Every structure is written in structure tokens, then in C-alpha cells.
């Protein structure tokens, strides 16, 4: 009888430890998210299931072109790409990103840009000053984010600059559907 009781206690302990580990991992390290909508096409598709790395920004800062998940509202998280960092002046002119006056390539958009006719624009011209807040440069602890599908994305052009403390984490790994399994550039 005692042996059977000890086995049950061992199983209960193991399950409690596993549950605690799962909660710690989910809350502090990694979380699943599902892409909702077309705002990150062609990079991410509606329904892509991804893993959010929450740990990356506990020890570091976002980098230009990171794909991040952030709290857009109390109940809704968005997935967008970091375009502008603290201290940057951002401008788009003729589908070219300028950071502090220097043109910067966006290789993840090249396929879409190549398909445009001469009189079409993929990213409408704007300057940082055109965004809510009328900033000359992005202030400390904020980033400017855009969706890769520039004509169909609710991003910093509408939401304003995103405080870094609202960023949940970085996402680069699709685990479902299986035909899209892998890392995203």
C-alpha cells in the first residue's frame, strides 16, 4: 500500500513541476501567436502559427527589420516589422526608405516592388513628422513599425510610435502550416 501511495505522490510531484515549468516558459520565454490578416504579406500569411520569443528583448533591444509582436490595444496584439529605432529620422520617398537621410534597402519587399508598374507606389511617401506626435526623430524607448503589406496595414502611420515596453517579443519561426515550417527572414 505504501509503495502504491509513493508512486502516486511521485506522479503528482512530476505533474506539478511540469505545470510550473510550462507556465514559466509560456509567461516569460515563448508563446504561440497566430497571424490574423494580410498586413504582413508576402512575408507572413493569414493563419500562420508562430512562436514569439519574449526573452530576446529582456536582454536586448529591437533591431531594424525585426518582426515583433506588440500590444496594440488592451485585447489585441499586432505583428509588424521594426523600421525606425530611437534617434532615427524616417522618410519614405518613391518607395525608398531613408534613415537619417541615407537610403536603406528592404530586401523583403523587393519581389513586390519589382512587380509594380511605373506609376504605382507600394509605400506612399511620408515623413516621421507626418505621424501622430510630429517628431523630428524617434524618441528613446519607442520604435516605428510597418506591415510588409504597406497598402493594407494598420501600423505606426495610424497608431503612432510604439513604446518598447509594449513589445511582447520577436517572432521569426512558423510552426504551422507544415509547408511554411521554418524561420522567416
Language model features by range: what are they?
Residues 2-8, 24, 28, 42, ...:
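Soluble "head" domains of membrane/secretory-pathway proteins
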Residues 13-28:
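Hydrophobic membrane-insertion alpha-helices, especially the h-region
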Residues 29-36, 40:
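Signal peptide cleavage region of secreted peptide precursors
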Amino acid at each position: 500500500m505504501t509503495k502504491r501511495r509513493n508512486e502516486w505522490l511521485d506522479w503528482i510531484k512530476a505533474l506539478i513541476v511540469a505545470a510550473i515549468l510550462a507556465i514559466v516558459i509560456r509567461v516569460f520565454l515563448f508563446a504561440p501567436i497566430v497571424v490574423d490578416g494580410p498586413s504582413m504579406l508576402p512575408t507572413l500569411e493569414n493563419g500562420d502559427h508562430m512562436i514569439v520569443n519574449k526573452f530576446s528583448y529582456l536582454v536586448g533591444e529591437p533591431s531594424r527589420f525585426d518582426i515583433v509582436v506588440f500590444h496594440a490595444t488592451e485585447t489585441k496584439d499586432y505583428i509588424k516589422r521594426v523600421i525606425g529605432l530611437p534617434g532615427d529620422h524616417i522618410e519614405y520617398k518613391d518607395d525608398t526608405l531613408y534613415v537619417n537621410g541615407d537610403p536603406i534597402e528592404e530586401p523583403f519587399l523587393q519581389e513586390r516592388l519589382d512587380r509594380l508598374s511605373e506609376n504605382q507606389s507600394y509605400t506612399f511617401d511620408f515623413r516621421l513628422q507626418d505621424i501622430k506626435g510630429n517628431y523630428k526623430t524617434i524618441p528613446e524607448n519607442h520604435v516605428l513599425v510597418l506591415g510588409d503589406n504597406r497598402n493594407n496595414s494598420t501600423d505606426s502611420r495610424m497608431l503612432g510610435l510604439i513604446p518598447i515596453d509594449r513589445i511582447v517579443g520577436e517572432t521569426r519561426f512558423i510552426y504551422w502550416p507544415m509547408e511554411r515550417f521554418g524561420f522567416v527572414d
